[in-house]
From Swiss-Prot:
Pathway: Pyrimidine metabolism; dUMP biosynthesis; dUMP from dCTP (dUTP route): step 2/2. This is Deoxyuridine 5'-triphosphate nucleotidohydrolase. It is found in: Cytoplasm; Nucleus. It comes from Rattus norvegicus. It catalyses: dUTP + H2O = dUMP + diphosphate + H(+). Substrate binds at residues 126-128, 140-143, 151, 199-200. InterPro entries: dUTPase (IPR008181), dUTPase-like (IPR029054), dUTPase-like_sf (IPR036157), dUTPase_trimeric (IPR033704). It is an enzyme of class 3 (hydrolase). The modification Phosphoserine is found at residue 54. Keywords: Cytoplasm, Hydrolase, Magnesium, Metal-binding, Nucleotide metabolism, Nucleus, Phosphoprotein. Its cofactor is Mg(2+).
């Protein structure tokens, strides 16, 4: 009997040690005893959840990534994207406009938006309008806290008047990350290699 017990111990000890080593490694990789092993759609089963980030905080962060909008009238058209990876959402005119040559117009979309937290909305031209009709966009910044009717300033640099019809795509809205730095007045600034050179100082072309 003592010989049988010794043989059993010699066979069980290596597997037991491997099990204990694996358990310790998992515990360390998950941040000790506070680590939580869970299923994640991104990392797969057994991923370690950060105990410092609650489920509600993660949900709020995901909600903040949405571009929310409200239709202010029955004339409004919901923004759309041309493809899944398109940089901007197309904006649509809510009314008919006529823009004379070398003139501008404020085109209403009749939508109200809330850009994601930490972003601003940049209203950019549509390449098709620029190439075919010499239409450009101005004053294209939508602040994070703006809640008014989104209007697009269109400039007609063409020789002919430009007709905007209700439901036409007039511009694209791009959400860009932004910093909100504090303003600090100082006596001097650090010197740089470029210095005060500007307006073509870096080259002829």
């Amino acid at each position: 009997m003592p010989l049988l017990c010794a043989l059993l111990r010699s066979r069980l000890q290596p597997s037991l040690l491997r099990s204990l080593t694996l358990t310790s490694a998992q515990s360390l990789s998950c941040g000790g005893s506070r680590g939580v092993r869970t299923w994640s759609a991104r990392t797969g089963p057994g991923a370690c959840a950060d105990p410092a980030v609650s489920v509600s905080k993660r949900a709020r962060a995901e909600d903040d990534a949405s571009l929310r909008f409200v239709r202010l009238s029955e004339h409004a058209t919901a923004p759309t994207r041309g493809s899944a990876r398109a940089a901007g959402y197309d904006l649509y005119s809510a009314y008919d406009y006529t823009i004379p040559s070398m003139e501008k117009a404020l085109v209403k979309t009749d939508i109200q938006i809330a850009v994601p937290s930490g972003c601003y909305g940049r209203v950019a031209p549509r390449s098709g309008l620029a190439v075919k009709h010499f239409i450009d966009v101005g004053a294209g910044v939508i602040d994070e806290d703006y809640r008014g009717n989104v209007g697009v300033v269109l400039f007609n640099f063409g020789k002919e008047k430009f007709e905007v019809k209700k439901g036409d795509r007039i511009a694209q809205l791009i959400c860009e990350r932004i910093l909100y730095p504090d303003l600090e007045e100082v006596q001097t600034l650090d010197n740089t290699e470029r210095g005060s050179g500007g307006f073509g100082s870096t080259g002829k072309n």
